[in-house]
């Protein structure tokens, strides 16, 4: 008789051979790490600054126009533009003509 759990095989995820790299370690830091003569505090702060810069450049533009709802779906943020009625200072000529139309 066939294996009763054959359907479980359809939901298995394929294992990836390599893990995703979340950050990059600069190559000169790994070379300097072998030398024990360096001041570790200065090297650590230098590495931290570089890692922060890498993360900031990669994640700065991702997901700014998208928000995640409670259900986990992505929703696009829409920019609300100000109308001319709310900001008459943008076009003073049109505001004056509107006032004259209202008065007549």
Swiss-Prot record:
Pfam families: ATAD4. It comes from the Eukaryota. InterPro entries: PRR15. Belongs to the PRR15 family. This is Proline-rich protein 15-like protein B. It comes from Danio rerio. The lineage of its organism: Eukaryota, Metazoa, Chordata, Craniata, Vertebrata. The gene is prr15lb.
